[in-house]
Swiss-Prot record:
Its EC number is 3.1.-.-. The lineage of its organism: Bacteria, Bacillati, Actinomycetota, Actinomycetes, Mycobacteriales. Signal peptide: none annotated. This is Uncharacterized metal-dependent hydrolase TatD. It comes from Mycobacterium tuberculosis (strain ATCC 25618 / H37Rv). InterPro entries: DNase_TatD-rel_CS, Metal_Hydrolase, TatD-like, TatD/YcfH-like.
Length: 264
């Protein structure tokens, strides 16, 4: 299995040894690769180093939409340098977050987020790397910017949590939907009803660790080793065997991120 989106630094990793420890725990649960994702410039530097420390780790770099105010000319130049690294496999996470403005001190305003999102879209197109989207309560805004700018060849909706209408739009566009532990939450009714509409060939699985720990460990700290719980919940919703879902989503991740051959 491939954890298509995680945050090893937020899980407590600091150096090569602590990265290896997290990845070894994941490997023992059948997770053979992880994509660790940046949310600011400091973490973009860190995830790139982490991907050099262990061959099972890959990186994605961008500024999180809530931090879009920090996208200065200097930040753009550094992100362009980092995204060219061969171990960086995606531009992300970027997008639009309409939940935090007004709730989180220092959160970028929506118009600033839109401008930063457009820049990251262009970066993904220029580099040929997948675009990894953070969308929180912003379906219409995300679609508006993607349509205005033109989507890259590969688009990944990280931690997809929208309804059936948004799922159909994304599927019809050929985008990938990455599902987290949220699919195991009985309270996530709209998402769980939307999942059967998603072709498994367009699905990825992720932990978004240390957040969104899947059932039955909800409320505890999440790590990449918890990914099989999400795979089992997803398998139940699409009426497939967990082993089959693991195989297909691993193949999807390999293709999307250009990971090459690896064990499922």
């Amino acid at each position: 299995m491939v954890d298509a989106h995680t945050h090893l630094d937020a899980c407590g990793a600091r150096d090569a040894d602590t990265v290896r420890s997290l990845v070894e725990r994941a490997a023992a649960a059948g997770v053979t690769a992880v994509v660790t994702v940046a949310d600011d410039l400091e973490s973009a530097r860190w995830v790139t180093r982490a991907a050099e420390w262990d061959r099972r780790v890959y990186a994605a770099v961008a500024l999180h939409p809530t931090r879009a105010d920090a996208l200065t000319d200097a930040a753009r130049a550094e992100l362009e340098r980092l995204v060219a690294h061969p171990r960086v496999v995606a531009v992300g996470e970027t997008g639009i977050d309409m939940y935090w403005p007004g709730r989180l001190d220092g959160c970028a305003e929506p118009h600033v987020q839109r401008e930063a999102f457009a820049w990251h879209i262009d970066l993904a197109k220029r580099t040929g790397k997948p675009l990894m989207i953070h969308n929180r309560q912003a379906d219409r805004d995300v679609l508006d910017v993607l349509r205005a700018e033109g989507a890259p060849d590969t688009v990944i909706l990280h931690c997809f949590s929208s309804d059936a209408a948004m799922a159909r739009t994304c599927v019809d566009a050929g985008w990938l939907l990455s599902l987290s532990g949220t699919v195991s939450f009985r309270t996530a009714r709209e998402l769980r009803e939307a999942v059967p509409l998603m072709p498994v060939e367009q699905l990825l699985v992720e932990t978004d660790a240390p957040y969104l720990t899947p059932h039955p460990h909800r409320g505890l700290a999440n790590e990449p080793y918890c990914l099989p719980y999400t795979v089992r919940a997803l398998a139940e919703l699409v009426n497939r065997r967990p082993e089959e879902v693991a195989l297909i989503t691993t193949s999807n991740a390999r293709r999307a991120y250009g990971l090459g051959w690896m064990r499922q």
